[in-house]
Amino acid sequence: SVISNLLPIGISDALMVSSAQKILVTNLVSNRNQTHHFTPDRYLKVFRKYTHTEFPFNILICPNLSQNSFEKRYPHIAKSYALEHAHFLGWTVNELDAVSRKGIKIESSDIISITPHLNRLRHDPQKLARVFKKIIG
């Protein structure tokens, strides 16, 4: 969990005073005990709680597929994760807009890759690099 990295003394203060871009790359798949049914707004609320800051991140990078779209495109992978009580974390335009209206920039992009063995979802490093280059310039 990334939350434990935010708990040491001084991290919240550093986040508040830093002028750096603070970027959150969301999970691709829910974790039953951590991010099950998380929305972008829920991410923001949890990060606010543990950092005690209004804007613990100002950019959110997430997949460009909603959960429904993913399940239609990759039904065999969705079923495999469902057997583990997990699901793809992709969101609707309305769910993303809810966070955007709070001042968080949304970068919804093709950032996933599927492993050839076992059909597992991973953040694709090359795809993420393109998104980071776009953000950072």
Describe every region a protein language model picked out.
Residues 4-12, 38-43:
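Charged helix-capping and loop-helix junction motifs
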Residues 37-137:
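C-terminal functional extensions of proteins
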